[in-house]
């Protein structure tokens, strides 16, 4: 379990309130297998940012108060403000509500937020997650805004594009922020099929805090951007073994969530 039992969330449980329940309705029995992407293969920033770590600056840590507890990444959108993470990073699931007071620090490392902290809002998860904590729908979207910003988040750090209906076996780059580390963990390996609605990958050193970390295929070695096909989550909230991670399969339900998020930003 990558986040729900972390000391970070326990310490701030008193501030977790029920948010607005933005939901969509999708047929869970009719899974699309047609590959779909959200845009071009490489939504690069307007100017190349410095890359002080092995991770893409489009990946960052989610914070509540002064502690990071999950991982998120920027996904391409016309507005340039959309984040992708695990549903359990922004919503408590069955019987719970949306978390509040979240901020996002893209490119975070060594206690430094090189692009500042961005307020997370407009969180969105599928009804199957909010009603029953369905591990096959452990995917969430949100938007990120910074007071006084003159450029969009995506124009500063770039963005991965979203793909649905992808192959189960693909070479990926996996990135996540362990909650006991100030630098991101990065691993490259090939995914496999856990079941009809779940992916898995073996990558050592992805413990609590890495939930929501993106699974990126076709990473550009210069920009470190590519196409995201999953996030750490799903089965056992991403897995109870830090050396094996899981993701809900990105299908038409995920695409519908993305489209609903971009339609209201």
PLM segments and residue spans:
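Catalytic nucleophile loop of clan PA
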Residues: 205-231
């Amino acid at each position: 379990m990558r986040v729900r039992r972390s000391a970070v969330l326990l310490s701030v449980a008193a501030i977790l309130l029920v948010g607005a329940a933005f939901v969509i309705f999708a047929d869970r029995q009719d899974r699309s297998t047609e590959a779909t992407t959200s845009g071009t293969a490489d939504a690069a920033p307007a100017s190349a940012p410095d890359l002080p770590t092995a991770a893409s600056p489009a990946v960052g840590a989610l914070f509540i108060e002064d502690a990071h507890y999950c991982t998120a990444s920027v996904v391409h959108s016309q507005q340039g403000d959309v984040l992708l993470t695990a549903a359990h990073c922004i919503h408590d699931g069955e019987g719970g509500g949306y978390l509040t007071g979240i901020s996002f620090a893209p490119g975070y490392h060594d206690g430094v937020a090189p692009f500042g902290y961005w307020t997370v809002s407009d969180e969105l998860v599928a009804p199957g997650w909010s009603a029953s904590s369905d591990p096959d729908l452990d995917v969430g979207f949100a938007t990120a805004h910074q007071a006084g910003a003159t450029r969009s988040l995506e124009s500063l750090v770039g963005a991965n594009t979203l793909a649905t209906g992808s192959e189960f076996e693909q070479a990926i780059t996996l990135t996540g922020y362990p909650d006991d580390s100030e630098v991101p963990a990065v691993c490259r390996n090939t995914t496999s099929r856990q079941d009809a609605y779940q992916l898995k990958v073996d990558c050592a050193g992805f413990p609590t805090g890495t939930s929501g970390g993106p699974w990126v295929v076709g990473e550009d070695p210069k920009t470190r951007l590519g196409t995201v096909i999953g996030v750490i989550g799903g089965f056992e909230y991403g897995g109870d073994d830090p050396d094996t991670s899981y993701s809900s399969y990105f299908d038409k339900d995920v695409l519908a969530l993305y489209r609903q998020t971009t339609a209201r930003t």
